[in-house]
């Protein structure tokens, strides 16, 4: 069965495994996940669990948010996502904890990549640069815009522009350790996003 939990990326560190090897890990805080709503086949046409994470300041809460959260006896949440899974094991208002996952499980982590601002074609699309010699008039430019005949540049041309700030999913990461008391997941390797950014940890589609 697919599982999922919402969390905050706290940063990276390293731990030693049983064989004494250093393992780089990302620490994800998952404390405070609450089931806000259950989507069922009869009502919605599909099954999913709606999770809420991270409280909204009282002065910024509106009536729809308060009413939706009140059905789960919870406070309004900043971060709300649906996890497509069977709803039989869940109840509205139930708290989802770090022990949803166990050490050794493979997960997919989705987050928003760091924004890099306006970037050129070389940095943004990993293109090669031209010769840097004095006679060359082509160094870090995008190159040909395409044939003359269409009288336009085709959509999808790899050009400079805003880089980063996009939804990114890293697949098949191993959960190295689960700290239930502190509500932490230690995921092997790097995950998308800056520190304190929101992430979704779900059962790996291709793993396990």
Curated annotation (Swiss-Prot):
PROSITE patterns: RIBOSOMAL_L3
Single GO MF descriptor: structural constituent of ribosome
Keyword Ribosomal protein: yes
InterPro entries to which the protein is assigned, alphabetical: Ribosomal_uL3, Ribosomal_uL3_bac/org-type, Ribosomal_uL3_CS, Transl_B-barrel_sf
Region (Disordered): 126-150
Recorded GO CC terms: cytosolic large ribosomal subunit
One GO term (biological process): translation
Signal sequence, renumbered to the chain: none
Key words of the record: Ribonucleoprotein, Ribosomal protein, RNA-binding, rRNA-binding
Residue spans crossing the bilayer: none
UniProt similarity note: Belongs to the universal ribosomal protein uL3 family.
HAMAP family named among the record's database cross-references: Ribosomal_uL3_B (MF_01325_B)
SUBUNIT field: Part of the 50S ribosomal subunit. Forms a cluster with proteins L14 and L19.
Entry function: One of the primary rRNA binding proteins, it binds directly near the 3'-end of the 23S rRNA, where it nucleates assembly of the 50S subunit.
Protein name (Swiss-Prot/TrEMBL): Large ribosomal subunit protein uL3
Lineage: Bacteria, Bacillati, Bacillota, Bacilli, Bacillales
The gene coding this protein: rplC
